[in-house]
Regions:
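Short, composition-biased local secondary-structure segments
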Residues: 1-9, 189-197
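Long amphipathic alpha-helical coiled-coil segments
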Residues: 185-186
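A cross-kingdom marker for long, charged
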Residues: 191-268
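Stable alpha-helical elements in mature extracytoplasmic
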Residues: 113-116, 173, 219-226
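Short coil/turn segments at secondary-structure boundaries
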Residues: 32, 130-136, 189-195, 238-240
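Preference for long, solvent-exposed alpha-helical segments and helix-linker "stalks"
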Residues: 2-154, 161-168, 176, 180-182
Length: 268
């Protein structure tokens, strides 16, 4: 949408708005963005936006698997509850028994993934925004000051798996998850991040250098081959773009120029 605004391409803008609403975006998400809000106001598109939302949102709601959504929400809440209790609280204040608490949480997250989450993925596909609800990811501003540090998606299953792979694990689910990438249910970046956690905390050495990274140059060729297989850029190119983006974002913040295409969800 932002690119359509920059290019002043009304046809493309309406097309992206329709696609966005069909994927779960709300009108307020558009007007929260200063660049898009100005374009809507300038071209008096408010009625068109609201009309398109009424039509497309019905299609979106019909596409949601509410039973799966409810189950994933419950699993995420269960994981979060016990992670906070055992890892973030008890293991911090009672460090002498840290190993006991880590093992206790390990048994809980293992049950959540092995017994509940994996069968759901096998049956329905990876539960992300494509088949369950899309969420606003970020902290909403409590003041009149605009907040640009947000994104959209559904990261609940992702977080569960990151917690799961923070312990030593084998490769039992690697192919299942990779197949979900090829099916379009799981973003390559998320799969690569999960595998990086597995590589960091297990004896398995199959880094993608998406989240955790190895500095061993002898492994770079194999890493980029794995990245290419799932549609990711070489990690060196990704890192260069990230650093270039950081520089641009810093300049935008210092100049307080927010009416530009956002490079990252945290880039105001």
């Amino acid at each position: 949408m932002q690119i359509a605004v920059i290019e002043n391409d009304m046809l493309f803008f309406k097309k992206t708005v329709k696609k966005g609403f069909e994927r779960g975006l709300l009108p307020e998400y558009l007007t929260n963005d200063s660049l898009i809000r100005s374009y809507i106001s300038k071209n008096k598109l408010e009625k068109i936006i609201n009309s398109e939302f009424e039509i497309s949102n019905k299609k979106y709601k019909k596409s949601i698997n509410y039973k799966l959504l409810d189950t994933i929400n419950k699993l995420a809440n269960l994981d979060n509850k016990w992670k906070i209790y055992y890892l973030d609280s008890l293991s911090t204040y009672d460090s002498k028994n840290k190993d006991i608490y880590w093992k206790k949480y390990d048994s809980i997250i293992s049950d959540i993934v092995d017994v509940k989450l994996i069968p759901l993925i096998t049956k329905y596909g990876f539960p992300e925004e494509r088949n369950i609800d899309l969420n606003y990811l970020g902290i909403k501003s409590l003041s009149n000051k605009p907040n640009y540090n947000y994104s959209f998606g559904n990261n609940k299953a992702k977080l569960i798996l990151l917690h799961y792979y923070s312990y030593p694990r084998d490769k039992s689910y690697n192919q299942l998850l990779k197949n979900e990438v090829f099916k379009g249910n799981l973003q390559p970046e998320i799969y690569a991040s999960i595998m990086d956690f597995q590589s960091k905390f297990s004896i398995i050495d199959e880094y993608y250098n998406e989240w955790h990274q190895t500095d061993d140059t002898t492994k770079f060729e194999a890493i980029n081959k794995r990245r290419l297989e799932i549609g990711l850029l070489p990690f060196e190119e990704k890192n260069l773009k990230f650093k270039r983006g950081q520089k641009i974002c810093k300049e935008k913040r210092e100049n307080k120029n927010f009416k530009q295409v956002r490079l990252f969800y945290w880039c105001g």
